[in-house]
Amino acid sequence: MSVMFDPDTAIYPFPPKPTPLSIDEKAYYREKIKRLLKERNAVMVAHYYTDPEIQQLAEETGGCISDSLEMARFGAKHPASTLLVAGVRFMGETAKILSSEKTILMPTLQAECSLDLGCPVEEFNAFCDAHPDHTVVVYANTSTAVKARADWVVTSSIAVELIDHLDSLGEKIIWAPDKHLGRYVQKQTGADILCWQGACIVHDEFKTQALTRLQEEYPDAAILVHPESPQAIVEMADAVGSTSQLIAAAKTLPHQRLIVATDRGIFYKMQQAVPDKELLEAPTAGEGATCRSCAHCPWMAMNGLQAIAEALEQEGSNHEVHVEERLRERALVPLNRMLDFAATLRG
């Protein structure tokens, strides 16, 4: 695998943490959101990495809690005229690309993703221009402009299958932006891949020494790892997969104790799936006992109850997602290819 670009030195400023709400304030905003969803003919689409109270609200109001692939499917098929996307900005943009006729609202448009930030379109276009004989495959965690340059968009849940398919056709591949997922896919498929060097700030923080110590403390535990994690962490895993695949693995593994190396937001749905099992967070702190993300995306944490209520009530430039039509049409092509390919996998 060749490595052509290294944005590792980028340090992304974290957003301020939302102000904690009292029990009464939470109850007030929950009821307000439920009322506004009905009034607006809106439905919530929430990612597994949002806070538990946000996922619970999506459940209670008939919304969706899922990985980014299922979020895209659900939003496109749901009859609601407005989608409230609780996640990060690329998820809102993806919803708009697939459902241009709908109003797409987000609690904040400032909810970024380090993978998206680490793949600026100008540099990525230059990278692709330098390798015109390669098929361009980009992860869903990218901007509309980067998707518009791609031949395929892919999520972690179908990444191995898609790259294996392209490799069987003899295609050379540009993969962006996650270097760890790219390395994992290359190892699984043997494909010829040029890999962009982005990383998720959460998964990149998992440490082998700390994980080994936790494993020694709980030798009966299985280790579940998202493939956005470093290779050394992936190699320690009993199960590797996307968020939905890790939840499925939690159910099928016989172990009663699970160490989970992904954003701790997943614990809400995973614990529902395995109520009798003990879930442990994989450590992100290094030898200095410090961490930046501490196993929770700071931008996902921006999706608070107050911000959701404000988005439904105020709309406007601070909350509504807009995508340039020219870019939307171009990005729709690789997104639809992904959805069509995923449909063939489901049979």
Swiss-Prot record:
The keyword 4Fe-4S applies. This is Quinolinate synthase. GO terms for biological process: 'de novo' NAD biosynthetic process from L-aspartate. Gene3D superfamilies: NadA-like (3.40.50.10800). Pathway: Cofactor biosynthesis; NAD(+) biosynthesis; quinolinate from iminoaspartate: step 1/1. Catalyzes the condensation of iminoaspartate with dihydroxyacetone phosphate to form quinolinate. It catalyses: iminosuccinate + dihydroxyacetone phosphate = quinolinate + phosphate + 2 H2O + H(+). The gene is nadA. Keywords: 4Fe-4S, Cytoplasm, Iron, Iron-sulfur, Metal-binding, Pyridine nucleotide biosynthesis, Transferase. Its cofactor is [4Fe-4S] cluster. It comes from Escherichia coli O17:K52:H18 (strain UMN026 / ExPEC). Belongs to the quinolinate synthase family. Type 1 subfamily. Binds 1 [4Fe-4S] cluster per subunit. It is found in: Cytoplasm. The keyword Metal-binding applies. [4Fe-4S] cluster binds at C113, C200, C297. GO terms for cellular component: cytosol. GO terms for molecular function: 4 iron, 4 sulfur cluster binding; metal ion binding; quinolinate synthetase A activity. Iminosuccinate binds at H47, S68, Y139, A140, N141, S156, H226, P227, E228, T243. Its EC number is 2.5.1.72.
